[in-house]
Amino acid sequence: MAENNTLLRHFFAPGADADPEGRFGLNSKSRRRRMREIIGIVGKHRALEGFTPEEFRAMLEDLGPSFVKIGQTLSTRSEILPKVFCEELTKLQTECDPLPFDEMLAALDKEFGGRRKEIFAEIDSKPLGSASLAQVHRAVLTSGESVAIKIQRPGVKATMALDIDIMRTLARRASRYMKGEQMLDLRAVVEEMWATFLEETDFRREAANLAEFAELNRDCVFVACPKVYTDLCSEFVLVMEYVDGIPIGDADRLVANGYDLEEIGSKMLDNYATQILDHGFFHADPHPGNVIIRDGRIVYIDLGNMGRLSARDRAGFGDIIEAVGLKDPGALKDALMRFAAKKDNAAIDHARFLADLDLLLEDYGSCDVAEIDVGQFLS
């Protein structure tokens, strides 16, 4: 595509704002270059002609880590995509072509310098896992402990920053031609993506999350997370206890090892309610690739994306849950209205809202969790 493409020049003009923190060297030239790359990849996959689930996954992988993250989220949203697409996108949770081991060692040397061999007695060249953001290798400290090293992929932070900054610019510029209310939510979503990006790509934050999660759940005998070696962590490297176990999504293997799937689901839901309602500090990305079962315990192994709730928000969730338990549509409506960020009573058909809630409670109010199709519920 030509450099003077009218659309690209309009959206990514020289006066466009760069990233707010000014950390990634983003500018109109880098935006246009990346946008041409995105358009080229979409064109290569002939997306406008439609695609199979496999082609859609492959396109997201080619587009890079930001789009892989979006695909991971979509894999759990059967109310948005057909089931066959969701099933294919689950591969994005655990599968990604690994980088050469030499590149990972170079990244470690950049962080530790000549200390790497003083810290690690051995590092397995075969990765335990390779995701869009980072690669994990098993290692042994010189002190003898078995650990997992999470190493951020070189250059991935700058690419993700550029992608999200492009999304921000598109949303902001396009809003000039649309009603403000139509774009408000989209712009808020992009800003939330930026905040999540900053948190997930700074492994010092994940180290702090691991320590806080362990402390808050210390009395829960069936939930755990890896021990973190804070003094060995940095923005780009996380060192934590190596935890072996069965992925929570591997139902056949869990059953073969004597686990009760209903019991696991019940315990996980119980603890998740505790995280939200009591702690106000909860795992915000609990997809199957982030949770394993070891010795009867539910182990969260990736705490890069955590959420926090104020006391007011926790109380609001409690009111919603109580109303569902009582199968009271009026109380549920009031609880949802109190919890909403914005309330425009004039824009709400209260009678229809109550009728819809009544049907919702009739369908789901007395269901076991295992009986609920979450995607269908949300739709």
Q: Where does each model-flagged region fall?
A:
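Helix-rich C-lobe and terminal helical cap/extension of kinase-like folds
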Residues: 14-30, 191, 234, 243-245, ...
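Conserved catalytic-loop position in the HRD/HxD motif
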Residues: 280, 285-287
